Amino acid sequence: MGKEVRQQLEQQLKQRILLIDGGMGTMIQSYKLQEEDYRGARFVDWHCDLKGNNDLLVLTQPQIIKEIHSAYLEAGADILETNTFNSTTIAMADYDMQSLSAEINFAAAKLAREVADEWTAKDPSRPRYVAGVLGPTNRTCSISPDVNDPGFRNVTFDGLVEAYSESTRALIKGGSDLILIETIFDTLNAKACAFAVDSVFEELGISLPVMISGTITDASGRTLSGQTTEAFYNALRHVRPISFGLNCALGPDELRQYVEELSRISECYVSAHPNAGLPNAFGEYDLSAEEMAEHIAEWAQAGFLNLVGGCCGTTPEHIAAIAKAVEGVKPRALPDLKVECRLSGLEPLNIGPETLFVNVGERTNVTGSARFKRLIKEEQYDEALDVAREQVENGAQIIDINMDEGMLDAEACMVRFLNLCASEPEISKVPVMVDSSKWEVIEAGLKCIQGKGIVNSISLKEGKEKFIAQAKLVRRYGAAVIVMAFDEVGQADTRERKLEICRRAYHILVDEVGFPPEDIIFDPNIFAVATGIDEHNNYALDFINAVADIKRELPHAMISGGVSNVSFSFRGNNYVREAIHAVFLYHCFKHGMDMGIVNAGQLEIYDNVPLKLREAVEDVILNRRSDGTERLLEIAEAYRENSVGKEEDASALEWRAWPVAKRLEHALVKGITEFIVQDTEEARQQASKPLEVIEGPLMDGMNVVGDLFGEGKMFLPQVVKSARVMKQAVAYLEPFINAQKSGSTSNGKILLATVKGDVHDIGKNIVGVVLQCNNFEIIDLGVMVPCEQILKVAREQNVDIIGLSGLITPSLDEMVHVAKEMERQGFELPLLIGGATTSKAHTAVKIEQNYHAPVVYVNNASRAVGVCTSLLSDEQRPGFIERLDLDYERTRDQHARKTPKSRPVTLEQARANKAALDWANYTPPAPAKPGVHVFENIALATLRPYIDWTPFFMTWSLMGKYPAILEHEEVGEEAKRLFHDANALLDKVEREGLLKASGMCALFPAASVGDDIEVYSDESRTQVAHVLYNLRQQTEKPKGANYCLSDYVAPKESGKRDWIGAFAVTGGIGERALADAYKAQGDDYNAIMIQAVADRLAEAFAEYLHEKVRKEIWGYASDENLSNDDLIRERYQGIRPAPGYPACPEHTEKATLWQMLNVEETIGMSLTTSYAMWPGASVSGWYFSHPDSRYFAVAQIQPDQLHSYAERKGWRLEEAEKWLAPNLDA
C-alpha cells in the first residue's frame, strides 16, 4: 500500500503543479458556530468548554467538514487535508479529550476519503487524494517553557512519538493516501513525528508518501526554534518525503524568498501553502483571491513550485484563483544536486568534496577534558556551556559531546547538557556529535537535537545483526554515523585491515540498510606513534594510506578520527603535540580526510611549525627513518615552553612609498591619522589650489570608503575612523582655502537635532558622520533643541533637509509638533525622522499627515545617504516620493485595520486576573540597611567588570553577542579593534579621571493598594509620603495573569510589611564636555566612543548597585554568587523596572522617584521637560524583591484604564492621553 499512490503522484507532479486545499479554520469560522454546535448531541454535558476545538467537528458536525472539503475540490484542489491539525493526544488534552484522539483522526480521514472518492468518481482521470495531517502539537521539544530553567522540557521525544503513532495509525485506517507533517515550528517535534510515522509504516507493512511543511515564523527567516530554512531541510531530509515545503505564519510576499531557497536546495518536490497575507487588526486576512493568485503565478513562472495551496485566511475562492493562475505553467524540475553530507544545528553544514577540513570540537568530552569532567561532575552546567561556546568561537564546526564516566549518570547528563545547549544559539548553531560507548546514551542524545547530528559511533565488533539494528535506528532518528574500523576480530591496526572492515561495513549499510553513503563517516583508528615500540611506527602512515584507499573505493563516504590520539606519547609537551597534529592533519587532508576531532583553539598551521621540528615530526609520521622516534625525543625538550612565533610584517609601512593620492586613500580606508597632515601638505604642494585636494584625492578616498561600506566590506566603526582622518585633513587645509576665499561644493546641507526634552544623540551623531563621509554638509544643533531654534537655524543657514532624532517616547509628540510648525510656517524642506523610539508606522500615521512636504523615516545610518541623495536629486526625487507616498498609504491602511493580537479585556476583568501570589505564606524581607545610600564618584574599575558589551557593538551597527562577536566571520576583526579602542579609552578615562560615576538608592516601607503602591514616610506606616501609579496589562491572557507592578508588593490588607526600592545612577558626569572636545578636534570617532562607553558605565553601575542591594543593603540574597553573564541574563531574584520602559511606560513617574531620593540635590542628575535624564548616560528605576517578580510589557490599554489612571493621578484626560499615547490605539 502506498507505492502505487506515490508512483501516481510523481507522474502527475512531472506534468503539472498540483493543488492543495486551503484554510480549514477560516472556513469553519465562516459558519459562526457556537458552543452548542461544537458539543453536538454527544458532548452536551462535557465538563469544559469545547468551542474552538475544530477537530471535534468531524464527530459533532461532520456535514460541515464534508461541505468544506467538497468546496475545495470544486475549486480545483487535488489534495484534501484532513481536519486533524490538533488531533494528537497531546493537543486534545487541552479539552481533556485525549482519549478521543484515535477516533477523531479516523473519522476525519474517513470523511475526507468519502468526499475525495465522490469527486474522483466524477472524473477518474483526475484522482483526488487525502493527506492525513499531523500538526505540531502545542508543546516544543527543543525549547523550555520555563525561562528560569532552559534545560526543562514539558514534553519528551518519546511522548511525542507515542502521540503521533496513535494518530498515524488512525489516519491510515481511515483511508489517508499520504501523510502530511505540517506547520512545523520545532524541528525536534517533527523528527519525533517522522520517527513515529516510519515506525508505524514498519509495524503495518506499508509505506505511504510523506509530505513535510515547515513554518518560517517571521522576517528573521527562521523557525520558532531557531533554524534557517536549509538547516530545517537538512534535519528532515532523511524522511525522503515526496515533497518538502513551507506554510503558515507569512503571506506570499514575505514567504517568497524562503520558498525560492527551498526550491534550490530540495532534492524532492517543493510545496507551499502560505497565508492570505498577514493578519489585520481583527485577526483576519486581507489578501484577496486575485492578489494572492498574482503572487503564486509569479512563483510558478519562476520555477519554484510543484504543489501549492493556502493556509490561514484562504478560502475556496483563493484556491480557484490559484488553480487558474498556475494552469498550464510548467512545474519545477527536480534539480541535479551534488552529493553532500548535509548536517545542521540552527544553521546548515554541508560537507562535500570541495569542503575544507571540518573541525570537530573535542573539549566537551569528559574522557578528554579534565575541566569539562569536573564541571559536569559538580553540575556547573553554565560553565560547561562556556566550554562548548569556546570551542565554537575557536572554529569548531561540530561539537563532540561525551559523558562516559563511571561516576556519572551519562544518560541524564547528556540530556541535561544537550537541552541547555539548545537554549544557546552561539552553541546550537553547529551540529552535534553524540559520542558514547553506550547505545542508550546515544539514543537519549538523539532525542534532544533538532538538527541533523552525528552518532559516534557504531561498529561490527558485536556482530552484523546488532550493527544493522543500530544503523536502522540512526537512520530513523535522522543522523549521520561514524563507523569504527572494529569488527568481531578486533580493531583494525594495519592499512589492509582498515580498508577490509570499512568496505564490509559500507556495503552492509548501503546495500542492506539503505543508508545514504554520504552520511557514513569512517574512523579507521588513529593510534599513537613514537611510543618506542617498533610495531607502532607505521600507525600514522597506515592511517594516511587507508584514508586514500577508502576515499577511492567507497564512493561518498567520509573519514574522521580523534587526532590527539596520534601524539599521546608526548603528553605534557603541548607545543610538540600541536606540531604533530599539524603535520599529521596536513598529510591526512591531502589524502582525503574530511574531518577530525580536535581542540579547535589549539590547531597549529603546518607552515608555522619550525622547520627543524617539522622535519623531525614528519620522519615519525611518515616512518621515514628507523631512528625517527629518538631524534624527535631529543629535540622535543627544546620546544617544551615555546609557542609558534609570528614574524613581524616587514611590509607594514610599504604603502608609505606609494604616490600621495594612493597614500591618502589608504589612510582614509585604514583610519590612519599618523601621517595625514604630512601627506595632505604634500598633496597641497602638487595641486594648483588647496580645494583640489579635498575634491580630488580626499573625496576619491572617501568614495572608496563609501563603496566598501555599502558593500558590507567596511563596518561603521571603520567609517567613523575614516571620517576622523578626513576631518583632520580638511582642518589642515581650511586656512589655505580661506586665504584664497574659495568655496567648496557639497551634495547638500542637512540640519540635525535631537528634539526638545531628549538628551540622546549617539545615533544622530553616527548619521551625521556617515553623511559627512558622503560629502553632505552637516549642521548639528545637539540635544534638547526646541522647535523654534531648529526652524530659525534652518532658515538662516538655508538648509536642504531637516533631520530630527529622539530616544524617549515623549519625543514622538515633539516631532509631531515640529512637523505642524513647519507646515504652519510654510516650509518646503524634506523632514527626516529617526531614533530608537520612532517607527515607520508612527511617522506615517502621526507625523507625515501634518506636513505636506516629504517626511521620511530613516531607520539606520546606512540608509540615510540614499534617502538624502534621492530627496536632493531632480531625477530621483519624483519617483522616490511617489514610492514613499504609496508605502505610507499602505502603512496607514494596515494600521487603521489593526487590532491587538490578543483580545482586549475590561480593567475590571484584568484586575480580577492579577498575579495570584500567596501572601499568606510569604514574609517579605526587611532591609538589612534601610535608608538612603549615596555612592559618589565610584571607581570606574569597580564598574567595568559589570559591563554588558553586546549593546555597545549594536551602537556601532555591529550585530552579534559579546564575546562571540569578536570571532565573527565577517565583523570579528572590526569588533576586536572597536573593543580594544573602547577599553583603551576607558583606561585613559579611569587614569585621568575624565568621567565620574555617581548614584544613590534607598528602600522605603510600602504596600500595594489596587494597581498603585503607597510609600510610607517611616516604618510606622501611618503616613503616605508618595504614591507610585501603575498600569495593568489589558489583553486576554488565557494561560497567565494580567500583570501590574503593584502585584509584587504586599497588599495593604494583608498586613505584611513590605518594602520597595528606588535608585538613580549615572556614568556620564563629564561625558558631554569630553565629546564636545573631541568634536572640536575633528575626532568624531572618540566623540561617539565616549558617549557609548559612558552609556555602558551607567548600565554597569545599575547592575552593580542592584547586586549590592540584593546582597547587602536589602540583603535578601546574601548568598548570591553570579557571573556577569548571569547578571546580564537576569538570573537573580527581583527586578529593577525603569519608568518609561514596558512594565511602567509612563515617564512622569520619574518625578516621584526624584522627590523620594532628592536626586538632583544629592548627585546632580536632573530631568528635562520630557522627563529624559541628564546626563544622558543615566539609569533610574524601582527595586522589587518578590521571588515571583518578572518583567513584562503593559502594551495597549483601553479607555477605562486611561480614565482610571487620569483620575488617580489627578490629571485632565488630555494630559493622560499625551503621556500614555504610545499605549493607546491611534
Curated annotation (Swiss-Prot):
InterPro entries: Cbl-bd_cap, Cobalamin-bd, Cobalamin-bd_sf, Dihydropteroate_synth-like_sf, HCY_dom, HCY_dom_sf, Met_Synthase/Corrinoid, Met_synthase_B12-bd. Pathway: Amino-acid biosynthesis; L-methionine biosynthesis via de novo pathway; L-methionine from L-homocysteine (MetH route): step 1/1. It comes from the Bacteria. S-adenosyl-L-methionine binds at residues 948, 1136, 1191-1192. Methylcob(III)alamin binds at residues 695, 757-761, 805, 809, 861. Residues 747-882 form the B12-binding domain. SUPFAM superfamilies: Cobalamin (vitamin B12)-binding domain, Dihydropteroate synthetase-like, Homocysteine S-methyltransferase, Methionine synthase activation domain-like, Methionine synthase domain. It catalyses: (6S)-5-methyl-5,6,7,8-tetrahydrofolate + L-homocysteine = (6S)-5,6,7,8-tetrahydrofolate + L-methionine. This is Methionine synthase. It comes from Vibrio cholerae serotype O1 (strain ATCC 39315 / El Tor Inaba N16961). The lineage of its organism: Bacteria, Pseudomonadati, Pseudomonadota, Gammaproteobacteria, Vibrionales.
